[in-house]
């Protein structure tokens, strides 16, 4: 946290507003889902589910997806390349990956099986957070550059049913009459084009959130910090960034984009404390807990190796 007074001011502004004014916008991969499990083993992203399963279906597809990741992943996370310079590379990566996935002819049942067997896990407290938002009728937009069908299948498996307050804005597979994936939805959503210009294409959703002036935003990439750009009704946005590995250069940039940066935090403890305060559940106690947790996170400015998980000094499977 770079400016504690600004965070406190935003918190107070959101808390003082009616909960009917609240909107939560969150990324999925490595934000609601885990970057690693409690033993330190890497978890998958929604695209990673296909990267992993591809080898069991087609060795050729597995090699193609792996080579694409090796080529483009360093570009996505290079702090010395501007977003404008990254965008055409991300578009190439996403479109090429999607084209090869569609060519393989995956069926809905195959994808459901991939999800059921994948090492895809929710962060500790994420299920409770989603159910809390459902109980208070607060819209949760899961804004993902991943594969929306994977998110849908996974949440139905984890939650039992799909809460009606959750809206997935993502790359969705379209199926033919035989439940074979034949195309991806447009427009393409990649890491650096996640903003309200995309949400505005979802007419009923855009109308539903038009009166929501307070935004709680959560993401794990620099692009995620811009997910609220263009929300005309927005008056205040509190942004929480999850930096899942130790990188001093990236940490500085995350602190520019987010109000709060949590380093290698595989829980939803801080967001849940904030929501508890908004919903007037032990408000004073929660505010005190928030302050305590954020004070402890100040050492993230000089993060140590013990506070992050880095495999062979490289960023593991971030996509």
Annotate each predicted stretch with a short phrase.
Residues 117-141, 146-319:
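C-terminal cap/substrate-recognition subdomain and adjoining C-terminal extension
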Residues 1-180, 254, 258:
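Alpha-helical substrate-recognition element adjacent to the catalytic core
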């Amino acid at each position: 946290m770079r400016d504690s007074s600004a965070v406190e001011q935003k918190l107070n502004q959101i808390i003082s507003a009616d909960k009917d004014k609240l909107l939560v916008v969150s990324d999925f991969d490595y934000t609601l889902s885990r970057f690693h499990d409690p033993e330190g083993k890497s978890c998958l992203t929604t695209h990673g589910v296909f990267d992993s399963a591809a080898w069991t279906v087609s060795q050729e597809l597995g090699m193609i997806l792996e080579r694409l990741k090796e080529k483009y992943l360093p570009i996505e996370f290079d702090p010395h390349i501007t977003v404008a310079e990254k965008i055409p590379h991300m578009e190439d990566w996403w479109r090429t990956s999607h084209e090869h996935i569609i060519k393989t002819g995956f069926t809905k049942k195959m994808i459901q099986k991939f999800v059921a067997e994948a090492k895809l896990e929710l962060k500790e407290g994420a299920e409770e957070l989603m159910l809390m938002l459902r109980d208070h009728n607060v819209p949760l937009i899961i804004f993902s550059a991943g594969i929306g069908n994977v998110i849908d299948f996974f949440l139905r498996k984890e939650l039992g049913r799909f809460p009606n307050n959750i809206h997935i804005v993502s790359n969705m597979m379209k199926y033919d009459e035989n439940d074979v994936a034949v195309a991806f939805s447009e427009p393409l959503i990649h890491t650096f084009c996640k903003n309200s210009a995309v949400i505005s294409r979802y007419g009923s959703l855009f109308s539903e959130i038009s009166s929501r002036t307070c935004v709680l935003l959560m993401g794990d990439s620099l692009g995620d910090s811009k997910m609220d750009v263009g929300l005309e009704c927005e008056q205040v946005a509190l942004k929480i960034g999850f930096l899942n590995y130790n990188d001093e250069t990236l940490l500085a940039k995350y602190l520019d984009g987010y109000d709060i940066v949590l380093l290698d935090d595989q829980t939803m403890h801080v967001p849940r404390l904030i929501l508890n305060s908004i919903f007037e559940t032990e408000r004073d106690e929660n505010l005190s807990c928030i302050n305590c947790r954020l004070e402890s996170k100040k050492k993230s400015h000089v993060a140590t190796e013990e506070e992050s998980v880095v495999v062979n000094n490289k960023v593991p499977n971030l996509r």
